[in-house]
Design a protein with these regions (language model features):
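Conserved, structured core segments of small domains
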Residues: 1-98
Length: 98
């Protein structure tokens, strides 16, 4: 049975801090990969946490291992631009995701 998880990612060693996110190496491949995960319902919502090197994803999955496995295919992870820092089961108690 699937459930929700809060996942945080952070910029890794290969991140070029002189460039904006959209100009990082393989931006288009990363964006297409994430868009596909969102289109299939794996990624529910997500985006950068302003003022930090981190991003937050809300993911629907069976377990943390599934998340790690799926996200390991991200072109930015393979290039060393991103790393997952936390995968935590999350319960939505206020509002809705539609």
């Amino acid at each position: 049975m699937t459930r929700l998880f809060a996942v945080t990612n952070t910029r890794s060693a290969a991140w070029n801090h002189a460039l904006p996110m959209e100009e990082q190496e393989d931006w288009k491949a990363h964006a297409a990969f994430m868009d596909a995960l969102q289109a299939e319902g794996f990624v529910v919502i997500g985006g950068p946490l302003e003022g930090t090197p981190d991003a937050l994803l809300i993911i629907r999955a069976n377990d943390a291992e599934e998340i790690s496995s799926r996200l390991s295919q991200d072109p930015w992870r393979r290039k060393g631009l991103l790393a997952t820092t936390r995968i935590i089961p999350w319960t939505l108690r206020l509002g809705s995701l539609g």
